Amino acid sequence: MAERANLVFHNKEIDGTAMKRLISRLIDHFGMGYTSHILDQIKTLGFHQATTTSISLGIEDLLTIPSKGWLVQDAEQQSFLLEKHYYYGAVHAVEKLRQSVEIWYATSEYLKQEMNSNFRITDPSNPVYLMSFSGARGNASQVHQLVGMRGLMADPQGQMIDLPIQSNLREGLSLTEYIISCYGARKGVVDTAVRTADAGYLTRRLVEVVQHIIVRRRDCGTIQGISVSPQNGMTEKLFVQTLIGRVLADDIYIGSRCIASRNQDIGIGLVNRFITAFRAQPFRAQPIYIRTPFTCRSTSWICQLCYGRSPTHGDLVELGEAVGIIAGQSIGEPGTQLTLRTFHTGGVFTGGTADLIRSPSNGKIQFNEDLVHPTRTRHGQPAFLCYIDLHVTIQSQDILHSVNIPLKSLILVQNDQYVESEQVIAEIRAGTSTLHFKEKVQKHIYSESDGEMHWSTDVYHAPEYQYGNLRRLPKTSHLWILSVSMCRSSIASFSLHKDQDQMNTYSFSVDGRYIFDFSMANDQVSHRLLDTFGKKDREILDYLTPDRIVSNGHWNCFYPSILQDNSDLLAKKRRNRFAVPLQYHQEQEKERISCLGISMEIPFMGVLRRNTIFAYFDDPRYRKDKRGSGIVKFRYRTLEEEYRTREEEYRTREEDSEDEYESPENKYRTREGEGEYEILEDEYRTLEDEYETLEDEYGILEDEYRTLEKDSEEEYGSLENKYRTREGEGEYEILEEDSEEEYGSSEDGSEKEYGTLEEDSEEDSEEDSEDEYGSPEEDSILKKEGFIEHRGTKEFSLKYQKEVDRFFFILQELHILPRSSSLKVLDNSIIGVDTQLTKNTRSRLGGLVRVKRKKSHTELKIFSGDIHFPEEADKILGGSLIPPEREKKDSKESKKRKNWVYVQRKKILKSKEKYFVSVRPAVSYEMDEGRNLATLFPQDLLQEEDNLQLRLVNFISHENSKLTQRIYHTNSQFVRTCLVVNWEQEVKEGARASLVEVRTNDLIRDFLRIELVKSTISYTRRRYDRTSVGLIPNNRLDRNNTNSFYSKAKIQSLSQHQEVIGTLLNRNKEYPSLMILLASNCSRIGLFKNSKYPNAVKESNPRIPIRDVFGLLGVIVPSISNFSSSYYLLTHNQILLKKYLFLDNLKQTFQVLQGLKYSLIDENQRISNFGSNIMLEPFHLNWHFLHHDSWEETLAIIHLGQFICENLCLFKSHIKKSGQIFIVNMDSFVLRAAKPYLATIGATVHGHYGKILYKGDRLVTFIYEKSRSSDITQGLPKVEQIFEARSIDSLSPNLERRIEDWNERIPRILGVPWGFLIGAELTIAQSRISLVNKIQKVYRSQGVQIHNRHIEIIIRQVTSKVRVSEDGMSNVFLPGELIGLLRAERAGRALDESIYYRAILLGITRASLNTQSFISEASFQETARVLAKAALRGRIDWLKGLKENVVLGGIIPVGTGFQKFVHRSPQDKNLYFEIKKKNLFASEMRDILFLHTELVSSDSDVTNNFYETSETPFTPIYTI
């Protein structure tokens, strides 16, 4: 008893794996016989206990989990939110699917964990619990189906059904759940049947290929080995598994002491010594070389030492053991077992979820924002990605918690946010588990309703291939399907409806024919549109066309449609300046200058006030074509005028596109620094004096200028800015202007307030036309108020009435460089053209360099011209212009000059008395007064003299002595001739001008239409209707009615019977389709109900930004220009508020909002940050901008064609539906219902822009990666593919490519005979290693342990053949014949001639049909063919394998039969030494091999993952 007391008593459960471990320890300790006795006793004990316990199992024992209810409810709420996000276009379909799968999968997994603890706590002796968790029958996932929830099912294709089964089998399933469950169960049944057969067949083929491998000798005498070293990133467990039971191929030394010798087998003790040695000196330890079946030199058998220990008992394997069959069965059997397992949990989806980090307590979270990068999670939520391990602190009231977040995790909260306890703050990337198979899947998204497709400007309009209609998305953006119902009109030319007119519902029936009835009544023709299928009231629309005579010629209807071919052209008409090819008669054409140079300019919203320029002409004579920048000087007619002498500093934009840097001066450059955008405002020079901090006051500018850059690529990237109309009737330029009209009523005092400003900025607001595309030149900065204002009305003040006699252009160059830049030239040095100034700027002029260092930047000026040092400095008048004939007295030269020169007086450095004079060449231009209206402008305009007075004014585009910077590609226009509206103030306040586009016979004609407005222009002005253009006959157009076609009707409210027509041009020319937008698809939203003057914003509001009249449609509705929209005050750059402000969560988050920073992202992904002075008022849902303690309410922007997402808080009322704004009234706007779909980068869009889609049409195709459900049924085919060597996707293509390379290169390096051998050996060795790794991976993922050596034996048979190539015709083998590598090597040695061959990867089926025994081949497949071939060749079967002997009924050569088969020869003992002598080359060859394979295995391609998509490359288990 005393002994018994000393024994250690272990009181713990033992499961299957612990049992295995115990048994193997017992065998090691006691040997086989004794162990079996012990196990026998355990068995008896077990049965005895089971009998006495008498466990019964009834349905009541299935206890459901109490927390299931609320877990499911929580998951449902999450997926409901997800649906909403999807509906609003915030996440796309793949993200939605992915997230819903993960939500339900996580719920199901959580339930599974709960189930375990629930049983353990409430009913530990529950029979279900005892049975499944002891491992007797059933496992956790099967019990989970019974008492947890059945979860997500997979359909027969292995795709996920995203409707989860929420009930379990104990509660019973609903009808829908039952059907889905049947889907899954059917997959399970099919899997079980098919996969079991597959697994069985795999086993049969495996056994077939290796049945003849028997242990026949003790030692084959190989000197090769495979190196194993923990430094390769192997885990210790794997290291131990790889080493135990192997035999060493080389002595192992630690220091100078040998701790293990060659041919010693490795037991657990030796492994432990290795591990301690490695831990002590990790880098000095040498790799351990072991023998494996790969290194065995025999062809058709294997030796004891290369095989190692027998898996059953721990000694070296016996001679005569049939190790091949053991190997085949060991690999095949788990497959059979694992497929049977699917029968119970058939079709249940399993996937991976990420680990979450939760907040330990309530508090404010803080982390370093510089170490994270904003990103979008795979569920479409915003998050931050950590570059490195991040330290996060959570400050609660009294305690500071700190949490570490590992590398590559996603942080799901913002900095300084308030988090609650157990709130998820981060998600650890699931990339650490590489076991899930990933595959690329296409997912098609289908349209949910009929509609018209629109997309934002981010999608390329040109299709990917020339004739296809597929488009790749360059960046993430929305696609919109605008709801529509179709109607085909039968007679094309008789449709009177202009695009976007409203009409009654009854006017169209599907095939209605329209009849015209022309009745003449007192000069006014009213066209009645009759509908044969109409209701009682037949007349639907009356069009009045005053002062028109109707000719009964052929009628055309016209509409602005989005043409496929012309879409670029239309997309270019973005803003309010149009170039108009006004048509005129042929005979008048000769008298006038061609109208190409004349550009019409329609001011914003088409209002012409007094002195407004509405057309101008750039005279080519006043254009400087060369590159370079300089100064313009005037000479007025009145010579009393003093010239300005002072050099002024102007802040201009750096002209060099290579220099990209941020500095406050460069605030105004666009990001790319393309040549097209210039901001050359004279006024900016006051910035520095008035405000030290540019950032705060004018920080907004940067955003606004940058917005233009988005369009620059597509629109102005090409320099062909002339677009021909179809017939080539002359070209017209498309010019743009981005100005906003300021309606200051006269009592505003706004005119007086900045009268001075208008004079100053007048000349540069009209920069030359060529190079101002899209640039916001009209901005000017008020010196008093300090805010940016757009003035569209350009008025001439008296300053410009002065006659300028001539003006001069003097070359000069200015570079503004950052303070830090190192200059390559000195101050006051003289340089030549194209001298390098800094690292990447060169000068364009030669001359004198002056450098000024300012606080924030360096200014470098280059003055062209000569330098003179006069004797008497006082006689020279600085800054004077000297005409050519006058010569300078004090210069040495006395010859006449051809050109004007400009003399400037300069000081040298700081000394007062030394002066020098720079004489600079000037180009002179004289003004020409000879132009008159008739030569410049068409007659049609001049005939309207009585209501419209115009006068012609020349003015100079640059201020006196202002430096003009010029980009290389553009010309400088100095003088512009303008047509100015010139009526007396008291007669009319203004006119409305708009352009009308008329398409007759496929020619586009544009007319300028001017309406005279009687009322004063102020904020409260009434709104005239949008135009509805009548019919125009195609024979000719009367000149005098250019301004007469517009309809006086007001738009009625959308009643029940109102619809809006949109016309659409088909490819089919005869029948245009009309889209009818039903009233049910539109919703009207009241805008400004309660305020009397909704937009009287005070002048001090610092942000009235640039306006952009361009819908997302890519086309301008022709009448946009006369929307007198006083409600177009934008808050900021057409920003949509894209945060989801649902009412329910607003109230909770209100406390937090104060601290947050908001950035709003609009449709074109421009991001603007508002800083911290915004407060969201959750109850009124209006945005307030808090500036300088004055509250100023600015309303959200509305503009035509804008898309609005549902639930956006624009006004006091919520927007109930997503849609596109397409009618804007004074107090409301009308939305056309639309559905947004989010599409990511790389998705393919089907169909053209504006295409009509029907319900169920394919819209987008996503390609995404998804993790396969990772049961063995998915894994087995992979194993089989590798064994059959036909794996297209899983075996990395790199490996095949590398085999090719090795086969070609190594013979070239080493010469022929050895080269082929080594090339083939290397290839084979390397591919063997990667194949073993891949197969092991599949089984390990299932928790199945198979010893490497089984797989190695089979892989060895698959890779041991080479194919004789045709290069060297040898006498021995036929080209293309498959022979063993060693046989080829021996034949080459015996023949003394080179045999050319290359390594080949055979599949197991082909390897079985390429053995040395034809009997075994014939009994496997293709019996007749094999036997016939063998008979023809006269093959001999030596009956070496098992199968041949079984077939013929002989004794099989294993076990006891082995001794009869092999006669041991006395030479065996000497074999090793002989081989040593023979292989003179062996040691060298081994070195080459090791050197080369080390190179190879360090390359991660070979050993790349089995599943190419997983994140971390899988390091090799061992290298050669």
UniProtKB/Swiss-Prot annotation:
GO molecular function, one term: DNA binding
One Gene Ontology term from the biological process aspect of the record: DNA-templated transcription
Cofactor note: Binds 1 Zn(2+) ion per subunit.
Pfam families: RNA_pol_Rpb1_4 (PF05000), RNA_pol_Rpb1_5 (PF04998)
Swiss-Prot/TrEMBL keywords: Chloroplast, DNA-directed RNA polymerase, Metal-binding, Nucleotidyltransferase, Plastid, Transcription, Transferase, Zinc
Keyword Nucleotidyltransferase: yes
EC number: 2.7.7.6
Cofactors, names only: Zn(2+)
GO cellular component: chloroplast; DNA-directed RNA polymerase complex; mitochondrion
Compartmental location: Plastid, Chloroplast
Amino acids binding Zn(2+): C220, C296, C303, C306
Acidic residues composition-biased segments: 730-748, 756-779
Swiss-Prot/TrEMBL catalytic activity: RNA(n) + a ribonucleoside 5'-triphosphate = RNA(n+1) + diphosphate
InterPro entries: DNA-dir_RpoC2_beta_pp, RNA_pol_beta''_euk, RNA_pol_Rpb1_3_sf, RNA_pol_Rpb1_4, RNA_pol_Rpb1_5, Rpb1_funnel_sf
Subunit and interaction comment: In plastids the minimal PEP RNA polymerase catalytic core is composed of four subunits: alpha, beta, beta', and beta''. When a (nuclear-encoded) sigma factor is associated with the core the holoenzyme is formed, which can initiate transcription.
Entry similarity comment: Belongs to the RNA polymerase beta' chain family. RpoC2 subfamily.
NCBIfam families the record matches: rpoC2_cyan (TIGR02388)
Role played: DNA-dependent RNA polymerase catalyzes the transcription of DNA into RNA using the four ribonucleoside triphosphates as substrates.
Full protein name: DNA-directed RNA polymerase subunit beta''
Gene name of the encoded protein: rpoC2
